[in-house]
């Protein structure tokens, strides 16, 4: 049951990304599109909390006994989002996808192995290590290799004189992924402290919304907003916030139960499989890209990796 839930919430992320991309084209700003997503997600979580009788605000007693870092989930989510926005035009789509994924896998294993942030302690056994290697191979076969082969000619045209080092940006991509895994662990701990995953998710999303709002006000992208275009936007694009909120809530619920590494692993597998399905059938306005044989091999490596990590 937990495994299926982890896969399911991961599969929502590519759909959320497609909806956010559509909204970004309408409002002409990635930050403004993110603000809509965060705000709608926060509202959705607030309604769920009210319906369940869960308080939106925490008491002073709970605030005092909860470590300060437990409230960093929203900040980490915001930093991860901002990093992806900044990295895309510099590194391209392939590295912007693969580097954060590697960062997430690495950090989730470290969190589990050392029990960081009071998470479930799951030492890295030899079988789990092999599972991690299998996951990385699967990700490379599915995401990196097909795009790399297509872009090889363009990359070969770049010379050292005209191609500045991108090492720091690549390192930023890995760190961004590590922050996202840390967010899962922190939100899971906060949910445990509050005895409510929905309240933890609401607090995280509220902080994220505030931070995105600060960025939007600073860059003044709201001046480009045209209400006439916003009214013409397909209603489904507003579901992006709902999907994002569901992802954060489910991760906060699952992390204390099965460990951060398992949550991140299942989410990534669900995310990749969902992306392949979208490309295969050209769903959500995506260009139709039939699954390649090498990607099928990659999926097999993914499932072997999941079995190695989850069963041992």
PLM regions and their residue ranges:
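Hydrophobic alpha-helical transmembrane segments in multi-pass integral membrane proteins
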Residues: 45-53, 108-121, 177-186, 243-255, ...
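Hydrophobic transmembrane alpha-helices of multi-pass small-molecule transport proteins
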Residues: 124-146, 291-310
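Structural motif at transmembrane-helix junctions in multi-pass transporters
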Residues: 25-29, 83-99, 192-196, 250-266
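C-terminal transmembrane-helix exit sites in multi-pass transporters
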Residues: 100, 106-126, 273-293
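Hydrophobic alpha-helical transmembrane segments of multi-pass membrane transport proteins
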Residues: 8-15, 19, 68-90, 179, ...
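Hydrophobic/aromatic residues within the transmembrane alpha-helices of Major Facilitator Superfamily
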Residues: 7, 11-15, 43, 75, ...
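Membrane-interface interhelical linkers
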Residues: 1-8, 15, 22-26, 31-35, ...
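Small-residue-rich segments of transmembrane alpha-helices in multi-pass membrane proteins
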Residues: 34-44, 101-109, 134, 162-164, ...
